[in-house]
Every structure is written in C-alpha cells, then in structure tokens.
UniProtKB/Swiss-Prot annotation:
FAD binds at V7, I8, G9, G10, G11, L12, G13, G14, I15, S16, A17, A18, I19. The gene is crtP. Its cofactor is FAD. GO terms for molecular function: oxidoreductase activity. Coiled coil: none annotated. NCBIfam families: crtI_fam. Belongs to the carotenoid/retinoid oxidoreductase family. CrtP subfamily. InterPro entries: Amino_oxidase, Carotenoid/retinoid_OxRdtase, FAD/NAD-bd_sf. This is 4,4'-diaponeurosporene oxygenase. PANTHER family: 4,4'-DIAPONEUROSPORENE OXYGENASE, PHYTOENE DESATURASE. Keywords: Carotenoid biosynthesis, FAD, Flavoprotein, Oxidoreductase, Virulence. Pfam families: Amino_oxidase (PF01593). The keyword Flavoprotein applies. Its EC number is 1.14.99.-.
Length: 497
C-alpha cells in the first residue's frame, strides 16, 4: 500500500519536500494556512508598485533546478531568472561607497578606492571561504549531517576542527585576513542571510561569501514569488494534493509516534509520516503541546534569530545612485549587533538593507517612480514587546538615516507605504516570536547548528525550513526539504530489507 505523507506548511522547505516525496512514489498532502504557496516568499502589489514581501535574493539556483531535473523537466520552462554581475552597493556614513561584483577582479576594477593590498586580501579571504564551502558541501549539504558529532564522525576530529574553523567567530576570521574597515563590515554583513551576528556566529558561515561569489546572485523576473509558483506547479504535476487556506490545529500521537493531523475544521487525516514546515518550537508548542520543561530546554539552546522592520515604499522619484541591492551601513557595527542580539533593543544606528528591483525590472513601479523595500534587522518579539510608538520613532530614525546618506527628501516623495513588524511576521507565518530566519547561529550556544531534521521526541516526524539544518535562506530551506525526503527514502529502503 502506498504510504501517505502529510506536509504542514507550504513554504519552500515544505513544497520541496512534497515534490521529492511525490517523485519517490508516495501519496502526499500539503496543508497551508495561507492562500498562497511559498511561505515568506510572498507578494504585495498596490498602486502600480510590486514588492517581494520576504526574501529578495536568489542564490544557488542549482538546488531548485535539481527538483525539476528529478522529473526530467527544466526549471527555465517554468520561471525566468537573471544573473546580476553587480551584486550590491554598500554605502558608508562617511560617504564612501563600495560595489561588490561577481569576481574579485571585477570588484577591483569597479572600485578605485580599493588598493592592491585590499584586492589581494579579498582574494585570500575568498580562498579561505572556498575551502570551508567545499568541506561543508561534502557532508553538511550532500549528506544532510545535523550535529557536531555527525560532522566529526564523517570528516574525522582534526579535519573537522581545522577545516570548519570552529576556533573562530565569523568576524574574527574576517578581521584576521582583511585590514580594510569598509570591507570588514561589508563581509561581516553576509551574516544577514541567517539573521545573526558576525561577532557571535561561527567562522564556518564565512562560506556564504564564496557561495555567492561562485554561484552568483540572481533575480527572478517579475518577483521571487514566481519561483514559488513554479514549484507549486511542479508539485501539482507530480500529484501532490495541495490544500490552501487549511490550518492544522493538532498533530496526533500514539506511544511517541505521530499518527496524523487534525484540521481546524475538526477533520482527522491519517499519515505514515509528517513533515512540518512550521518552525520546530512552535510545532512542539502549539501542535503537539510538548511539556514545559522540554520546551524551556529547547528555547535556551535555540534562541530565535533576528526579525525585521520591513518598509515597502512607493516613491514618486528616482534615485540614480541606488543599485538593485544596497546596504546602508552603521557607524559602529559591533554596537549594532550588540543592541539587536544582546541588549534586545531597537538599534540607534541600524544597518539597512534596501532593495530596488525596479533598477532591473521596470515592471515593478510606474514610469518615473521606484519601489523601495527597506529592511533593518531588529530583535525578535520580547516578553515586553515594542510599542506602536517605539516603531514610529524607529521609522523616523530609518528615514533620517537614508536621507542623510543620500536619498534626498525621501519622506516627501513617499506616495505609498506598507509596513511589516515582527508581530505581522509571527501572525502570518506562525514563526517563533516573529523571527525571520529561524534560530540564531551562535558559536557558544549551538556551534551554528540549527535543529536536526528528525524529531528527537516522536517517530516519523520530520522538520524542514529555516529552523533546521542546513539553515535559513531560500536555497537552504529548499535543500532541507530534499534532505528530509532522502532520510525518509533511506529509512523506507532499510525497512524493506
């Protein structure tokens, strides 16, 4: 008899797992509480402006292409992606700008401010990150290793310690090789992909730089939601039954084994395996009602990553100095990280990510106008949450900073505005305390590891998404879905012997 898989949540991890399980011959039902597939890969359109509500950067497209190749299809027949050789522009408080290009040579050619020594150091750092990327690819990505003990067993103790560089934090690894203060800050902020602090995260995450340099940075034409739409279409073609607007209220268990789910309609649906794309702690807390003692233990080890104050602005002008992707850096990177990740306050001088897709895709705003998305990282929802007044003051701080750093009269030109706070993120995606990137990567607390993909408490329960390994970011959550499918397939193959 064909075994039945239930997938809770249609984020990229969930839809990826559903596709791979269907391709492997299982009966698959996916339940998504929202009316769209893609999770945080969401879309907002108003007054002629289009915005990606969630991620705006596509990297490692081969991870997505593999899903189509398993079905002997081509992703290019479903969605169009465009490589961006100019990866982003960095603005600094003293007026300095640095353009990051794909390739160290190209970056040097486009930045007269960078010396020969700067370029040599940047190349040296790239070589270092390449070594880390290569070894993580062998075990962490290809085999879905979930814990430090598994890493050590796979690579050997000395090899793992040296090549994963567990001795240093990410910022220490950067500062050891880079002397230019602007490059130090820019490279440190690659940690944005996982919503953590480069001063706390392990050096292994330095691989993010090589990943982007080697695999490129891409734009999904028309908006990144088209990628989710493509995966949804593939899933339906493979026979996945997708239920949108369908909320799972409870996971049923019997003798430490999951047996099915109860929907908000009261209907019970039986399952042989359950894959939750809901974050791990909210799954245990709200769907299984795990005891307080075990929940508290998990929360101590796995603290939520950062959230964000997300502004979607339609402006009645154009700012020629902006690139597609931009960063407006803080005066004091260490203080910014401290305030967000340790003091848990809204930062005084945040680093701001600003994306302006209209620079590449003119369909995203009316002629002569621009669509600007603004995202500074802020703490996840605290026991004493920030107030509406707190957010209003923070909004003014953001706009003051952007105007001061070159976006003249930005306030006057705003004709459309939509804002998402951590509370909105929590409400729409059931994310843990409104975190965007799952759990924080911390060298001391968790060595940069997230939750294992297989439940330690209940048989036949698996997790995908940003709260499990290999981590946050759209390629990683998509890969987590494929890795879970591999684990279930391997388990079933073993059971048949």
């Amino acid at each position: 008899m064909t075994k039945h898989i239930i997938v809770i949540g249609g984020g990229l991890g969930g839809i990826s797992a559903a596709i791979r399980m269907a391709q492997s011959g299982y009966s698959v039902s996916l339940y998504e509480q929202n009316n769209h597939i893609g999770g945080k890969v969401n879309r907002h359109e108003s007054d002629g402006f289009g915005f990606d509500l969630g991620p705006s950067i596509l990297t490692m497209p081969y991870i997505f292409e593999k899903l189509f190749e398993y079905s002997k299809k081509q992703m290019s027949d479903y969605v169009t992606i465009k490589r961006l050789p100019h990866q982003w522009r960095s603005f600094f408080p003293d007026g300095t700008t640095i353009d990051l290009y794909e390739g160290i040579k190209e970056t040097g050619q486009h930045n007269a401010i960078l010396s020969k020594q700067d370029i040599e150091e940047l190349q040296n750092y790239l070589n270092y990150t390449r070594r880390i990327d290569r070894i993580t690819e062998k075990g962490y990505f290809n085999y879905g290793l979930d814990t430090l003990s598994q890493i050590i067993k796979f690579h050997g103790p000395l090899n793992a310690l040296i090549n994963y560089d567990y001795v240093h934090t990410m910022q220490q690894a950067i500062d050891k090789r880079i002397s230019n203060p602007y490059l130090r800050q820019m490279l440190g902020y690659f940690i944005k992909y996982v919503g953590s602090s480069s001063y706390d995260a392990p050096a292994v995450l330095s691989m993010l730089f090589h990943m982007q340099q080697e695999q490129g940075l891409w734009y999904v034409e028309g908006g990144i939601h088209h990628l989710a739409n493509a995966l949804e279409k593939l899933a339906r073609e493979e026979g996945v039954t997708i239920h949108t607007g369908a909320r799972v209220d409870n996971i049923k268990t019997y003798q430490r084994r999951v047996t099915g789910v109860r929907l908000d309609t009261g209907e019970f649906v039986k399952a042989d395996y359950i894959i939750s794309n809901m974050e791990v702690i909210p799954t245990y807390k709200y769907l299984i009602h795990l005891d307080t003692q075990r929940l508290n233990k998990l929360e101590r080890e796995f603290e939520p990553a950062s959230s964000g104050y997300v502004m979607h602005l339609g402006v009645a002008c154009q700012y020629p100095q902006l690139a597609h992707h931009n960063f407006f850096f803080t005066e004091n990177a260490y203080l910014n990280y401290q305030q967000v990740f340790h003091e848990k306050v809204l930062p005084d001088d945040p680093t701001i990510y600003l994306v302006n897709t209209n620079k590449t895709d003119h369909t995203q705003a009316p002629v002569g106008y621009e669509n600007i998305k603004v995202l500074p990282h802020i703490p996840y929802i605290q026991d004493q949450p920030f107030t509406t007044e707190d957010y209003a003051k923070f909004r003014d701080k953001i706009l003051d900073k952007l105007e001061k750093m070159g976006l003249t009269d930005l306030r006057k030109h705003i004709i459309y505005e939509d804002v998402w706070t951590p509370e909105d993120i929590e409400k729409n995606y059931r994310s843990n305390r409104g975190a965007i990137y799952g759990f924080v990567a911390d060298k001391k607390k968790n060595k940069g590891f997230k939750f294992p993909k297989e439940s330690q408490y209940f048989e036949n329960l698996y997790f995908v998404g940003g709260s499990v390994n290999p981590g946050g970011g759209i390629p990683m959550v998509t890969l987590s879905g494929q890795q879970v499918a591999d684990k279930i397939n391997a388990r079933e193959a073993k059971n048949r012997k």
